[in-house]
Amino acid sequence: MSAEILNAQHNDDTFENIWQELKWRGLVHVSTDEAALEKALSEEILTFYTGYDPTAASLHLGHLVQLLVMRRLQLAGHKPLGLVGGFTGLIGDPRQTSERVLNSPEVVAEWVKSLRAQIERFLSFEGENAARMVNNLDWSGQMSALQLLRDVGKHFRVGTMVKKEIVAKRLNSDEGISYTEFSYQILQGLDFLELNRRFGCTLQTGGSDQWGNLTSGTELIRKVEGKSVHAIGTPLITNSDGTKFGKSEGNAIWLNPQMCSPYAFYQFWLNTADADVVDRLKVFTFLTRAEIAEFAEKVEKEPFKREAQKTLAYLVTSLVHGTEATDQAVAASEALFGKGDFATLDEATLESVVAELPSAKLSEDRLDMISVLTELGFAKSNSEARRILKEGGASVNGVKVQGEDAAISKDDLLHGRFAMVRRGKKNQGAVELV
């Protein structure tokens, strides 16, 4: 995120306090004592933390919720600690379905660097409440088994641990749960304790599916330090039709542009259903409630204009990928719908567009339009392709082509590689020269 975008962000000052805004935006599913938490957030400057385990090379949309909660709390004056789990990432928190595959220390170390760089883009590291990055390998990695069992494990009761929701599900499954993953909640509890001791951290935020791990920390601090600390669990976001949010055709939407292009990212948000778009604006943008109310009215009265979706897609893609990449994604989207010029797109954006379309890799001697249309599946036979060309039903890079002898020339190839082909209004594809 650019400094310009970061500096332009602000909370909605029509709310009495940040707690009320978080609740209105639907960002609180569960918490420790609500009255005490609201009072602390309103009257004190809290140091808080959110943890991110390096179980992949990139964060995804589920993590984006946490990153934006961190930023909202920072804008309210509180001090963020971004924790990357260099130690817990070697263990893996228990999933509801099966045991995680353990990654090598070398892989985890690389992923720690990647995640740290992503997290840093969403926070300010300047001013009185500057963010700080921490790694739990710095304390857990130095602890002996004896220290862990005597100083930490002694405060955990197995009866309580097995009642944690995910642990209970795994215990009742055919696969069960390993001692390694069963112990994860002890390690996350230790993180909160260490951050409380080192930085005076009194609040942890995370997804509600991690609630058992979050409360492991609050309980440990109460037993060891005699203090009451806080935790907030954000809701797991689902679509109005009951499907899981954050997936596209079963694949996670990553924040790394190499794993999910800015164009594909933009398209994901642009395709948000009318029934979901207002809630997404609340969670993922810094628009005020008055501004969001205006979009809610537009969705109700003029849904066909999709203004809310366009705004959502632009703002969130800008947050994650910057305005330059977002402008390219918008230009690509407009070109696909005949409202723009593919020639204005940079090569990376054009590649990402081609990846989302039916495409064919053809040699120079196969660039005649009859071959192109049949290879793309836009014509079932050469005779059908001839008919399409005779009727002027095909275009290349937005320019209509006609005649059986029509072909894509080298001059037509964008960046010397690609030609965008359309048949009629709905069939859009691409050819790549090989």
Residue map of PLM features:
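Short alpha-helical patches at coil-to-helix transitions and adjacent helical residues
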Residues: 63-67, 142, 213-214, 310, ...
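Conserved nucleotide- and phosphate/pyrophosphate-binding catalytic cores
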Residues: 223-434
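NTP-dependent nucleotidyl-transfer catalytic core
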Residues: 1-210, 218, 225-230, 243
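Predominant activation on well-ordered alpha-helical scaffold segments within soluble catalytic domains
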Residues: 116, 184-187, 193-196, 215-218, ...
